[in-house]
């Protein structure tokens, strides 16, 4: 069953050039969870991985092919490779997997980790050609594996595409080494060595550089150039060829000889018919074969060991082994091709009887029965839409010819909704106009309900395009045109009315509309809209100052996601985003950080432009902790994304706050002025994101000493906040106003504003906005807490804020960031040992945390790395600085800080 060569690491490396610049990057690999070699074909991913691991003793190698997408097959090969890497420490898990005595891959991996607890040596398992895996269950299981595997194991992946293994999260957490085609491409020196090893006459550096530039360092192209030069006696510069790809061999001949030919004709025919189904029960099989003994025959074949497995936990459901299913499909198409269409048509009808339109439409398309496809779409299309099966629907509709499509108004409306739901807003109007014209040509009258659905859809597009007035007009028109039976469009129109009122600052109208939207959406099981309504309600409650109520409502959103399995929809990230914002304002930074990372994980397979909010939050958290070097990396991501994409002001305002706070911490007034010169100045500030944008403008003016401009903007800001009853934003604005008064030396006014802000914070809990200006208002809070006019609650709040401000400032002082290190190593009085044996950035961070009194375990938690990694960093820095123990490390750090004037 298992192919030994798939578990054998490649040989024949004698002709490969050694690549120290890549190998150097891999020296720290034991301290990372994942090493990813990612590049197009022909860049030597497998060769490089094999060369690097050639002298490592504990390595398991799994060469993947496109038949490995069956979870059972995959995990068996994986466990065999893992056993090879760990001296067979997981033998019990291997037996469980082979016997299918597992409830899920996660439970199996938990058994694996338990067995590996006694194996402590450094080890590696290689997944070669992982891009051939397309099974989401395997991807999900491998994400679990990577998250929970022991520290002494490193997973090595080679892939042509970015694998969906949580790499965005691992990258941000510095738990992954990525070797891309930029690193795998040869540089000039490697090109010279490569050709000198293969060409008798050698090659000079100029020619090597010319060739490298011509093929951009692509190793396979260079190999072809060398071969052409050798065999055709041509110059190197003349020889450029493409590379052909080879297909993997199949096991069909073996299965014919060893299994299929041993069966009687009737059984062979039965198996070929059933093989049109990925999984099946007796009812489906009866519909296909008309055999009343279907269940008994399936069970007897299962007992016979014919690659038929019962589905665990499912009564009388079965599937073929993945390879055997492929083999049967091949035999079916070769031996009974005349039955192919009828089999798929019958399968489609059978799946409809099982209430599974997704499966039915798949078979209807394979039968090429377009009328049946239309019938399924008309009857079940909206149900599939509500369940999120968008790609299946769109593929089916796009395959229809114009006559069929435009003969059915329900399908043209569904087509437009599919475009909207996938954020192709600019196409929606065109699709509806085209449909209207085509329906008229066919004398199909579009009733008022169709017009109502179209207007509801256009209203959603308008609000997404920041046209609230137009959206409101269209939504109200739609509600007047739709009866209660067209529930989806009524839900959307109601939602749009609520959202428009939210955007316009009419919160008392917006909230009940969103509550009604949620109720309707839950009633009709349109759960995406129910979640959207919860998110909107949460934002409205936050704006009204009811932050605890919003927090509890968010909990109901998380429950809905869990109950309806919406974990991977983008709205889940939206919920995590607003939860993180509340947690940040409550100074619960660890929890906020976790939400941001989870958001990145959800959006892993979406456009990087969607990551802006997560990076904005991570930057803000790092700034709050004083980790400016870490924040700087997030800021670079933010600036790159803002240059690459166009965002709604809600997104840019959040990102701009992080930028301004970073520049404020760095004292970078030049960057702040540049931002201010081009900053959008909205005409109003009637909602939370326009308030934030104007507050950013005020903050920039204050930092630049432009106090009059700051005062004018603040007056406008507070006027708008009070007009629209934006309680939480009024609270935030008071803190900024106090900062302005303090900068203008008006201490009494600043204290009065802080007192008012403290009173409001009793309701909102918004302490984060005090902390970001702690350096300015800390002393004022101390004086204010001594005054008798503060209530007990406000005094307690002020005292807690002073502790937090003091803690943050102390935290900032102990972090050895990049600027500090650069100044230190260039200081004329720095010890020669520091200059000649420079520490890495991470080793400096570890030294700073040792000085702060952190234990090894606390340092590992702070830097989010394994404890073994911290021990290695400590050992390295002790050697480099000639330190014997922790006490000496603290003294050394203290001396360096004193040298720099701290």
From Swiss-Prot:
Regulation of its function: Activated by ATP and maltotriose, which are both required for DNA binding.
Protein residues bound to ATP: 39-46
Record-annotated DNA-binding residue ranges: 856-875
GO BP: positive regulation of carbohydrate metabolic process; positive regulation of DNA-templated transcription
Record carries keyword Cytoplasm: no
Protein keywords: Activator, ATP-binding, Carbohydrate metabolism, DNA-binding, Nucleotide-binding, Transcription, Transcription regulation
Gene Ontology molecular-function annotations: ATP binding; DNA binding; DNA-binding transcription factor activity
Family annotation (InterPro entries): P-loop_NTPase (IPR027417), Sig_transdc_resp-reg_C-effctor (IPR016032), TPR-like_helical_dom_sf (IPR011990), TPR_MalT (IPR041617), Tscrpt_reg_HTH_MalT (IPR023768), Tscrpt_reg_LuxR_C (IPR000792), WH-like_DNA-bd_sf (IPR036388)
Domain HTH luxR-type as annotated: residue spans: 832-897
Pfam families assigned to the protein according to its UniProt record, in alphabetical order: GerE, TPR_MalT
Family: Belongs to the MalT family.
Role according to the record: Positively regulates the transcription of the maltose regulon whose gene products are responsible for uptake and catabolism of malto-oligosaccharides. Specifically binds to the promoter region of its target genes, recognizing a short DNA motif called the MalT box.
Subunit structure, interactors included: Monomer in solution. Oligomerizes to an active state in the presence of the positive effectors ATP and maltotriose.
The name this protein goes by in its record: HTH-type transcriptional regulator MalT
Originating organism: Vibrio parahaemolyticus serotype O3:K6 (strain RIMD 2210633)
Record gene name: malT
